[in-house]
């Protein structure tokens, strides 16, 4: 039957509220966590007996293979669980993060959205077993969720890759569209510069594959400590690391966080050296320096090859200060700017002239460094 030509083209679809939201608005959700909480809240308001929900997305990341968001009705909170390479292959079913967590809340109904093996998985836990009609409604939700999840998965994949290779700060800038050459931001922060001692000799005596594994182990200890105390790794340069602890409140908080990160990195490297010794391998001595100042974090480079990098007097100073570790026979050096902001016991080492730095620098160290 032919429809009248003057029939309005925007006739409303007779869809339940949650499905209408999936069609009209869900694709613009700022993140998977907000998407899951919003969808769960709408299903709950629509009468479904939910205790919680879980959403799993595959991500193209060197280490993380899946991200699972877990929503609990009782608190409204959304938490995140990571699946790593070498873990369970299936993102759904018993043994997966989403299913096992939901099973603690109540009866589980789980749906794959799309084709395996990398399809999203959406699951729900009930306060009681889902009836046939309720189960059918959840299956219908799984069908309507495909389009907005495709958009979310694409954004999550891009974010994962950018964060893995650029770091959080640069990834956020690129995603926000601030990728034009010559742009940057001034950041006041506690700076950490660290690198391995005798790296050139070690690399000449070590097979390339073993050298890569050694660097990975070293970077894991340093970057892990930096991230654990709220810092961010800006650069890996050869065997070196440049990290910052941005000043968001009192400068002393950033300095204390940087000092705690150095302590954690030293502890991690001590365990690594013990493991290497048991394998008949040499230890990995390193030097680290801390300074407080302003850096310019900018997008610079050639017209067809850009990079985010940190420049400024503070970067130069912390790099030169780290180079003083070997001459002074110390593994950790701290500038006077950091020493003035911390209550951590430090040992003064006097004023030192740093190459390329106009004014002498007051240098301190840790008692056991």
Show which residues each predicted segment covers:
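Cytosolic regulatory/linker segments at or just downstream of nucleotide-handling modules
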Residues: 325-369
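Helix-to-coil/beta transition segments that act as allosteric "coupling" elements at the rims
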Residues: 97-121, 125-128
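Alpha-helical scaffold within the catalytic cores of cyclic-nucleotide enzymes
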Residues: 216-230, 247-288, 313-324
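Regulatory loop-to-helix N-cap segments in sensory/regulatory domains
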Residues: 123-139, 310
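Catalytic NTP-binding/metal-coordinating core of nucleotidyl cyclase/transferase enzymes
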Residues: 181-260
């Amino acid at each position: 039957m032919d429809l009248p030509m003057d029939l309005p083209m925007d006739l409303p679809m007779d869809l339940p509220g949650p499905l209408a939201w999936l069609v009209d608005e869900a694709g613009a959700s700022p993140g998977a966590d907000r998407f899951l909480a919003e969808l769960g809240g709408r299903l709950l308001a629509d009468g479904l007996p939910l205790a919680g929900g879980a959403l799993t997305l595959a991500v193209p990341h060197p280490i993380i293979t899946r991200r699972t968001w877990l929503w609990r009705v009782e608190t409204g909170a959304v938490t995140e669980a990571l699946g790593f390479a070498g873990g369970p292959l299936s993102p759904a079913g018993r043994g997966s993060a989403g299913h096992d967590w939901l099973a603690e809340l109540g009866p589980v109904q789980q749906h794959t959205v799309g084709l395996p093996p990398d399809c999203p998985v959406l699951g729900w836990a009930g306060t009681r077993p889902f009836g046939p009609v309720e189960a059918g409604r959840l299956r219908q939700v799984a069908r309507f969720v495909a389009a907005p999840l495709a958009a979310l998965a694409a954004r999550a994949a891009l974010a994962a890759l950018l964060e893995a290779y650029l770091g959080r700060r640069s990834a956020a800038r690129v995603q926000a569209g601030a990728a034009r050459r010559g742009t940057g931001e001034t950041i006041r922060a506690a700076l950490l510069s660290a690198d391995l001692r005798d790296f050139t000799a070690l690399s000449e005596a070590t097979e390339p594959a073993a050298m890569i594994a050694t660097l990975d182990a070293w970077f894991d200890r340093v970057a892990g400590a930096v991230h654990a105390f709220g810092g961010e790794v800006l650069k890996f340069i050869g065997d070196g690391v440049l990290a910052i602890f941005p000043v968001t409140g009192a400068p002393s908080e950033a300095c204390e966080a940087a000092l705690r990160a150095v302590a954690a990195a030293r502890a991690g490297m001590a365990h690594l050296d013990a493991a290497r010794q048991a394998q008949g391998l040499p230890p990995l001595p390193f030097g680290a320096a801390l300074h407080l100042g302003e850096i310019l974090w900018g997008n610079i480079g050639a017209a067809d090859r850009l990079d985010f990098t940190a420049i400024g007097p503070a970067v130069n100073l912390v790099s030169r200060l780290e180079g003083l570790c070997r001459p002074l026979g110390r593994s950790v050096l701290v500038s006077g700017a950091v020493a003035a902001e911390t209550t951590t016991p430090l040992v003064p080492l006097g004023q030192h002239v740093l190459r390329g730095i106009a004014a002498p620098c007051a240098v301190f160290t840790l008692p056991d460094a």
